Design a protein with these regions (language model features):
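Carbohydrate-binding surfaces of carbohydrate-active enzymes
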Residues: 471-490, 590-591
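Histidine-centered catalytic/metal-binding microenvironments
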Residues: 516-636
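Short, Φ-rich (hydrophobic/aromatic) sequence segments
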Residues: 19, 75-87, 449-464, 477
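Aromatic-rich surface patch/π-platform used for binding flat ligands and interfaces
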Residues: 383, 432
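Cysteine-centered nucleophilic/redox motifs
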Residues: 23, 429-431
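Surface-exposed helix-capping loop/turn segments at secondary-structure junctions
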Residues: 27-33, 268-272, 314-319, 553-562, ...
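Aromatic-lined carbohydrate-binding surfaces of glycoside hydrolases
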Residues: 7-8, 27, 49, 113-380, ...
Length: 636
């Protein structure tokens, strides 16, 4: 076996090692493969260029060419998929690697349809979990990793502190230690050739010497106090946290400090490919001082981003900038325009869910009024698109990217099967072109492979080629994950998804979409005090047990470790679903006290067994967001 790296970059060295390792597994160490890894244009290796790979291999001999080093790595994994490999999830026993004689012809010329195929850091993680996930991303077709914040201490501490898990001992994590983990994550991202993005929320107070660690959660430095947003007659922390606190962005001191900080930051980290610039998280936290009230928040925001752009350009720094349409900046600026529009692509959250998905329908009615610190939710997906259309017309920026939240917490309503989540996400990716969008940034847990990884697997496949058929992708995934028991497994998960149905447990909200505002009339749980739903939930335990009994008989003869791991996950998933159904049953019968007891049992089981599904299931995010804050929120 001779794998020749003609590019000799860090990424192609990794690609060479990966191809050599897998081919040795498939055909033995002494196989006759002769493959050259090359650039399509030997004079260009730009990580920002669109991905294209050309594979021309016959009987194990030929070339894999790419438009950049990352594209060559993507081409390596595409060739391995052609040979029958399947990359189902991160970690040991997460992939199918069949034996092969490497004979036959592989001719593929693939250009990624969507240039922005982005995964965003969320959930509870450590650097090892993230690096394992990063290894999986190019196998799934993604090209960019976005680390929120300069140092994502908030996500790392959730893991190290083992928040919500009484069975684990908290581990201290200083800001400096989190910064070291961040550097390791950044280095590995670059090794893979993935575009590396940073920031998002959480940069405003860094120029004032305040990081976003525990020391500065709800207090201000003396230097910062005079410069925070003036709201209701005072300047103070908003929402109890500086992460929810804006500055006065018309204040010349603030503007200069932020601009100077960006120059310093990108000089320190010239390897960053992009920075996402978002104002503070939260709502109703924009400055109401006399000067700020002269302009819209979006006009002030564009002026700030222009100042950052000009200063970076003067220093010869050409890192891409990604402004974000978010809360008060949903409305397009009235006067300000980006002076250098080719430097920007705009990130835009979209109001959607796993039932409706994206829509190409035009917004009907009157859009919400833009009134300072009087937050109104975006009514629906067409309204989100109207905001984007207004920004496109006002700024001249061509590239818009959806910031998608399907796999942040909404997918937990489909935790029984993930079938609805997978189909909706795949359909949404196909709709991007009709909506004029250039890709997706998935704001999601890094551990979304429980009970399966079909939603994010299908998303990656569709972002590369939206003409693929979802049914083909689903069958490909299930056959690899569950072997000859794939059909029975799909039927089982589909049935579970019918019993703990996305719509049956999702909050119902009536929304007025006229009059220039969105008024929530009422909000009720469909399953509370609903004996008919109780009858449905009561079927879950027997459904799980009957399937696992059949699956265990099948597993007696199954030898593949990856397939066995898939069924291990289904076992724990089934046990969690039984306990979830028991809690839902008591709530449906109107037994609130007994429901609360069952919820406690559910939480306990999830946390006690966390190590059993560590890489596949974000127990922290599921318990905090879905159980504690949504479905079983006290008082609901």
């Amino acid at each position: 076996m001779i794998i020749s790296d003609k590019v000799r970059s860090e990424t192609t060295a990794y690609a060479k090692d990966e191809l050599s390792r897998y081919l040795a597994q498939m055909a033995g160490l002494h196989n006759l493969a002769r493959i050259d890894l090359m650039l399509i244009d030997e004079n260009e290796d730009n990580t920002l260029s669109d991905d294209r790979y050309i594979i021309d291999i016959t009987d194990g001999k030929g070339t894999i060419k790419g438009s950049n080093s990352r594209s060559i790595l993507l081409g390596v994994y595409a060739y391995l998929k052609h040979l029958g490999c399947r990359f189902l999830r991160p970690g040991e026993n997460g992939e199918i690697v069949p034996a092969s004689d490497l004979m036959g012809q592989c001719k593929i010329d693939q250009k990624a349809f969507y240039p922005y195929r982005i995964e965003e850091l969320e959930g509870a993680v450590n650097d090892d979990i993230i690096i394992g996930y990063l290894k999986w991303l190019p196998k799934a077709g993604f090209n960019t990793y976005f680390i929120q914040y300069v140092t994502p201490h908030i996500f790392l501490k959730r893991w190290h502190y083992h928040e919500l898990n009484p069975y684990k001992t908290p581990e201290p994590l200083s800001w400096e230690e989190a910064s070291e983990e961040t550097l390791r994550i950044e280095a590995f991202t670059k090794k893979l050739g993935l575009q590396l993005w940073s920031l998002g929320h959480g940069f405003m107070f860094l120029p004032f010497g305040m990081d976003y660690g525990p020391e500065w959660t709800n207090k201000l430095s003396e230097e910062a106090k005079p410069h925070v947003a003036f709201i209701n007659g005072e300047r103070n922390v908003s929402g109890g946290n500086i992460a929810y606190t804006n500055l006065c962005y018309t204040d010349p001191v603030v503007k200069k400090k932020i601009v100077d900080w960006f120059v310093s930051y990108l000089k320190e980290k010239p390897y960053l490919d992009g920075v996402v610039i978002i104002l503070a998280d939260g709502i109703n936290n924009d400055c109401e001082c006399e000067e700020c009230l002269k302009s819209t928040v979006s006009d002030i925001y564009v002026d700030l981003v222009n100042a950052i752009d000009e200063a970076l350009t003067a220093e010869g720094i050409h890192t891409k900038l990604y402004p974000c349409i978010y809360v008060a900046t949903r409305w397009a600026p009235l006067k300000a325009k980006f002076k250098n529009p080719n430097r920007f692509a705009i990130v835009a959250p979209v109001n959607s869910n796993l039932k409706t998905g994206y829509t190409t329908d035009k917004f009907q009615g009157e859009m919400p009024k833009n009134e300072r610190n009087k937050y109104v939710p975006t009514p629906n997906s067409p309204a989100s698109m109207k905001f984007i259309e207004d920004w496109r017309n006002a700024t001249g920026v061509n590239d818009f990217i959806f910031n998608d939240y399907h796999l942040y917490s909404d997918h937990y309503f489909d935790i029984a099967s993930y079938m609805q989540a997978a189909k909706t996400l795949a359909n949404d990716v196909q709709k991007l072109r009709a909506l004029g969008m250039k890709g997706i940034m998935n704001c999601k847990t890094q551990r979304s492979f429980f009970p399966t990884g079909l939603p994010i697997y299908a998303c990656g496949e569709m972002l590369m080629n939206p003409d693929r058929d979802f049914e083909d992708i689903k069958n490909e995934y299930f056959e690899a994950a569950f072997g000859s028991f794939a059909k029975e497994t799909e039927e089982y998960l589909t049935r579970l998804g019918e019993l703990i149905n996305y719509e049956s447990i999702r909050i119902k909200t009536d929304v007025a979409e006229t009059g220039g505002a969105t008024a929530v009339k009422n909000s009720v749980w469909a399953w509370r005090n609903n004996p008919e739903m109780a009858k449905v939930f009561a079927q879950v335990p027997n459904t799980v047990d009957a399937f696992m009994e059949k699956a265990n008989k099948y597993l007696i003869t199954e030898e593949n470790a990856t397939v066995k791991r898939s069924f291990d996950l289904l076992y724990y998933h089934g046990e969690i679903m039984k306990r979830l159904a028991e809690a839902l049953y008591e709530g449906a019968m109107g037994n609130r006290e007994e429901c609360d007891k069952k919820v406690a049992i559910l939480r306990d089981y999830i946390m006690k067994n966390e190590d059993a599904y560590l890489l596949e299931f974000d127990a922290y995010l599921f318990v905090r967001r879905f159980i504690n804050e949504i479905i079983f929120k006290p008082g609901t």
